[in-house]
């Protein structure tokens, strides 16, 4: 039974909960450009970013971490990340989040060979970001009960995701219908204008020819 529940939870996790593991080499430059990772999260969804870097303070590099979303909200801005760092926040909107790393090179090191920071980045969101071991310990739950709660959490996220997709589809459909209606009426106006202009031109030419006694 427990193995079945675990299997179901893993299947659900493929659809909703996301856990991204990346290895990055971030070059250090005097005027660096940020290296960003983008992921989409739902509103009120918990996100945990785990960072592990090499290097040390005073090695001529300063690695900064900044987390924002596509709507301009800033969640975290951490300076001089060294070793292990953990950032957790709750998203405010259904939006894409950008996790950006910027590696600054100290001026006195600028004449040396190019240096980089090796970064291991883990991004977890939704049910994958929750500490289920802590929940099990605090509520004294059995492993099966923890898996059931995890499945319940994942199921709720699936429902919210489907609601969001449905609402988005309805908005896009309304936009398409409105656009089609405007194009239809614009086409009718253009055709009516062309017909009216053609009739006026025919009448004008008939009058012109009559004046000139051509017809």
Curated annotation (Swiss-Prot):
Swiss-Prot/TrEMBL keywords: Endoplasmic reticulum, ER-Golgi transport, Golgi apparatus, Membrane, Protein transport, Signal, Transmembrane, Transmembrane helix, Transport
Cytoplasmic side, ranges: 206-215
One Gene Ontology term, aspect cellular component: plasma membrane
Domain GOLD, residue spans: 34-125
Residue numbers on the Lumenal membrane side: 22-184
Paired cysteines (S-S): none
Principal subcellular localization: endoplasmic reticulum
Domain of life: Eukaryota
InterPro entries with a match to the protein in the record: Emp24-like, GOLD_dom
Residue ranges of the TM segments: 185-205
One Pfam match: EMP24_GP25L
Membrane topology category: Single-pass type I membrane protein
Signal sequence annotation: 1-21
Localization annotation: Endoplasmic reticulum membrane; Golgi apparatus membrane
Coiled coil: none
Entry keyword Transmembrane: yes
A Gene Ontology BP annotation from the UniProt entry: endoplasmic reticulum to Golgi vesicle-mediated transport
Physiological role: Constituent of COPII-coated endoplasmic reticulum-derived transport vesicles. Required for efficient transport of a subset of secretory proteins to the Golgi. Facilitates retrograde transport from the Golgi to the endoplasmic reticulum.
Family the UniProt entry places it in: Belongs to the EMP24/GP25L family.
Protein name per the record: Endoplasmic reticulum vesicle protein 25
């Amino acid at each position: 039974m427990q193995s079945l529940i675990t299997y179901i939870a893993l299947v659900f996790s493929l659809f909703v909960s996301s856990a991204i593991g990346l290895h990055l080499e971030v070059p250090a430059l005097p005027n660096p450009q940020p290296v960003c990772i983008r992921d989409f999260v739902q509103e009120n969804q918990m996100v945990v970013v785990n960072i592990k870097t090499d290097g040390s303070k005073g090695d001529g590099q300063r690695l900064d971490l900044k987390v924002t979303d596509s709507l301009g909200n800033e969640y975290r801005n951490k300076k001089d990340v060294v070793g292990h760092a953990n950032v957790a926040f709750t998203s405010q909107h259904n939006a894409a989040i950008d996790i950006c790393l910027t590696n600054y090179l100290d001026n006195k090191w600028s004449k040396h060979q190019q240096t980089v920071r090796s970064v291991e980045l883990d991004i977890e969101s939704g049910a994958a970001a929750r500490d289920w071991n802590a929940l099990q310990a605090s509520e004294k739950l059995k492993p099966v009960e923890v898996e059931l709660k995890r499945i319940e959490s994942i199921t709720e996220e699936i429902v919210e995701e489907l609601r969001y997709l449905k609402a988005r589809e309805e908005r896009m459909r309304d936009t398409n219908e409105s656009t089609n209606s405007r194009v239809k009426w614009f086409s009718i106006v253009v055709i009516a204008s062309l017909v009216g202009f053609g009739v006026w031109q025919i009448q004008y030419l008939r009058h012109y020819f009559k004046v000139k006694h051509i017809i």
